[in-house]
């Protein structure tokens, strides 16, 4: 989100549950590379059915020890070259999706401006962004932004411009 230049590199890390079209659109808005936060064991539609008490996310919600989701990788190519990082995630029970926590714990955000944003049809950003900042304990974390399901590309582009 935003423009890349020789003195500043921007990137976006995010856990997403949508398809490639949305990913290409996000890359266009960012103007920089994307890094997908991918659980080692992908979440299926059934896993994400929060109204089913036997679903994976419901069990993880009820038992915090299950929330330590292993990721395929936490190594972002050229991580040290980034000065601004956007972290996007869906909201689960008022918090960032569990895989995002694992990514944040595994990386050093020293010297980086971190701009969190979330997507949710109904839940607010809440304390999800400040909780991620506490997990990271490094970096200059900015106030987060929630985008609802009706947000369009122009809304996201306008927000990114405000961050620059």
Name these PLM-found stretches:
Residues 29-31, 137-140:
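A SAM-dependent methyltransferase catalytic signature shared across enzymes that methylate proteins
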Residues 1-82, 94, 157-164:
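N-terminal beta1-alpha1-beta2 submodule of the flavodoxin-like/Rossmannoid cofactor-binding fold
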């Amino acid at each position: 989100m935003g423009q890349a230049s020789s003195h500043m590199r921007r990137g976006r890390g995010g856990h997403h549950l949508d398809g490639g079209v949305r990913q290409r659109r996000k890359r266009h808005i960012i103007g920089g590379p994307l890094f997908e936060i991918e659980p080692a064991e992908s979440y299926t539609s059934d896993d994400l059915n929060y109204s089913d008490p036997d679903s994976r996310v419901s069990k993880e919600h009820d038992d915090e020890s299950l929330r330590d989701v292993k990721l395929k990788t936490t190594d972002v190519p050229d991580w040290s070259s980034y000065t601004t990082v956007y972290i996007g995630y869906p909201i689960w029970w008022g918090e960032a999706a569990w895989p995002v926590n694992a990514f944040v714990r595994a990386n050093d955000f020293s010297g980086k401006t971190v701009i969190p944003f979330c997507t949710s049809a109904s839940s607010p950003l809440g304390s999800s962004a400040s909780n991620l900042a506490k997990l990271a304990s490094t970096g200059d974390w900015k106030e987060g932004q929630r985008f609802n399901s009706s947000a369009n590309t122009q809304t996201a582009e306008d927000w990114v411009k405000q961050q620059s």
